[in-house]
Amino acid sequence: MSNKPSLSYKDAGVDIDAGDALVQRIKSVAKATSRPEVVGGLGGFGALCRIPTGYTSPLLVSGTDGVGTKLKLALQLNRHDTIGIDLVAMCVNDLLVCGAEPLFFLDYYATGKLDVDVAATVVTGIGEGCKLSNCALIGGETAEMPGMYQDDDYDLAGFCVGVVEEAEVITGENVTEGDVLIALASSGAHSNGYSLVRKVIEVSGVDVTSSNEQLDGQSIQDALMAPTRIYVKAIKALQDTLGSSALHAMSHITGGGLTDNLPRVLPDHLAASIDTSSWQFSELFTWLQTQGNIEQSEMYRTFNCGVGFVIVVPKDKADAAIKTLTDAGEKAWKLGEMVSREADAVVYR
């Protein structure tokens, strides 16, 4: 026999027992998000889900996303309870753009050293996001990778699948001149632009871990970490009230802001004319712009600037759409209109 010590996986930095403990902690989280279509529970090699009844020609819609360097701020502030909501929101809001109903969600959690309490807190947030989206958390992967990440660092990715009736897919091809753009308010910076947010914090000299500064009636920490708003229920209410045919286009305002995201869903011959007087920057965005001396054009192409989602509807449907969205709990307003395109796809006036 060799005199060398017998090595275990734990000696290499991977604690299987911690992983098992996490699974036990989060089983109830996943169960609380279940839908009737889900077959089985956590722990299998693959998760099963039926397509909901009532669809004639269903199309599956998939998406994946993360939360960027907002994670670095979460780690700095030791706030892990809402970052999971961010993860779900980034995925499900993308699926909404084509008119899809989110069905199920999976997450990937990678870390240098698994902290079961932190991971369970994150997954609890994912579960909360899934409940807000009527979306089942049906599986995921937790990877402990010593040497790949610093001990406490972790990264997240989310994966979502939804369903839409083929005849009701929203493509943007029906957008016409004179259509109205309706804005849905964001809850803050959502999950985009946080590398610039962190740079602004650095140059401002503000210690965000201890600052008592208030923005928008809340602590600067709460303002910076406010979870991304989930628009699933509001868009469902709009579809039920107006019908999908009245929703000519939708856009989730993420990285790239209004400037880069609106053109993704608009015809090449039309431009979105944005009425910049229709809303005011929140104190958060004003603080970021002032502390970072950021040009207005850079604000519009980096942050959502208070507009988290945009819907394009016929002019005669605008008032009904705003009322429906308001009744669903959203702050909604007329953001602008579609005009003939001369140069830029988005025009600020």
UniProtKB/Swiss-Prot annotation:
Q: In which pathway does it act?
A: Purine metabolism; IMP biosynthesis via de novo pathway; 5-amino-1-(5-phospho-D-ribosyl)imidazole from N(2)-formyl-N(1)-(5-phospho-D-ribosyl)glycinamide: step 2/2
For biological process, the GO terms are: 'de novo' IMP biosynthetic process; adenine biosynthetic process
Q: Which top-level group of life is the source organism from?
A: Bacteria
Entry EC no(s): 6.3.3.1
The reaction(s) catalysed by this protein are: 2-formamido-N(1)-(5-O-phospho-beta-D-ribosyl)acetamidine + ATP = 5-amino-1-(5-phospho-beta-D-ribosyl)imidazole + ADP + phosphate + H(+)
Q: According to its UniProt record, which protein family does this protein belong to?
A: Belongs to the AIR synthase family.
- Can you say what this protein is called? Phosphoribosylformylglycinamidine cyclo-ligase
Its source organism is Psychrobacter arcticus (strain DSM 17307 / VKM B-2377 / 273-4)
